[in-house]
Amino acid sequence: KLDAELLKVDGVPLRADSDRMINERVWESYGTAMHCNGNGACYNFDPNDAMCPSWKGTRERRHSPKGRASLLREWLLLQTQAGADVLQAPRGVWGFVKTLPSRLKNSFLTRNESAGDLSHELYEAMSGCLSCKACAGQCPVKVSVPDFRARFLELYHARYLRPMRDYLIGSLEFSVPFLSRFPAVYNALMSNSRIKELLHSRIGMVDSPLLSGTDMEHALKKLDVQIASPKALNALSKEQRKRCVVLIPDAFTRWFDTSVWIAFFKLAIRTGHTVMVAPYLPNGKPLHVQGFLPAFEKAAARQSVLLKTLSASGVPLVGLDPAMTLVFRQEYRKVSSGSDCPEVMLPQEWLVQSLPKIDTANQGQFQLLAHCTEKTNTPTSTALWEPVFEKVGLQLNMPVSGCCGMAGTYGHEARNMETSKAIYRQSWGPLVEQSTQEQSPELLADGYSCRCQVDRMSGLRLRHPIEVLLEKFS
């Protein structure tokens, strides 16, 4: 005899029943997570598909967009029932000071007592996200984990202290211009085994990249590249503006991969263009990834003002790194301070219009591994590299590939190192190894973090497509 009671079909609780208990304003504010319908497209086993790298690297459901959205909904329900404000975290200096006592208490004295609200479990799930935005581009209902991840991290760290690692990453764009004044000293420190061990064990960072050490002021002067300003741009005639381009610098290619920067200048100049470079301002992407949202909004406001003054001349603005450049189109547009940010083109979007055609037979084959954010969010733009190469008699193919496992600073965090390596071995590793075989086309990568990961994992430096194109105009 069984004592089990049969459940009525219409008596089984549904997800919608608990979702209705969440405050309507909260529901609408976190719509990208609330609208996850559980289709499971993110449970993708294909290693050569971009979504979702953390799921493929761990095979843990909490490390998938569906898992994170489900955890967030449950967390929001618990916060609603507890009367907590999840729409706005305390901000500003006063907010930081006011919450300091409670953050100290929660972090050191009563941390385990609050485990029932899922905060720590959700934090662990969010920490495993690469913020590659593949879900934002490929999920059928456009669940964007990086968006609600950043908001959660801001709220979480209004209750708990941040690790030093977060401040180091968030301040990178602001500190690197100063550090670049002493490249030899910086590189010596970052190469020292004791310093590396200290960074690993105490800060939680590994394999810090080294500065290029190029004297950019001298290089720009030698190439006759001016600093872009409204005055300099307005001084150009209408015809001169048609042959002018302004490069928007990002911290990574500017100081850590300067050869790509210089290659762009040379390519533009040799194809008859006048090149100017915008004054450097932090882009803010690392701040957004770590949940420093007030600081990100300030950075977006400053950068947007600069870009608007430069774009008023009608001269195209171009950014080299896909992940950093697409921030202007995506994260900036979602905050009031950057909602009217002008378009900054990816290099291939500008080159397909501006690069002169060379009448020559096919003189080489190449393969491009595109950045995850770029190929999942702007696939049409990514495909433009092929006609750009055709213009100069080169054949470019884009093999299907997954994620490289670096994703900005994700792969440089010690807690993510093993997952980062596992992701690389699934897709990029075999493709890179195959490219080293005789008669194989040269492999290229347009993402700075992707090139950094290949160098770290396989000991190879992949060239940027710009560097290949420059050879055709040497």
Which sequence ranges carry the predicted segments?
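Iron-sulfur cluster-binding electron-transfer modules in prokaryotic oxidoreductases
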Residues: 17, 30, 146-474
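Ferredoxin-type iron-sulfur electron-transfer modules in oxidoreductases and energy-metabolism complexes
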Residues: 2-39, 43-179, 297-303, 351, ...
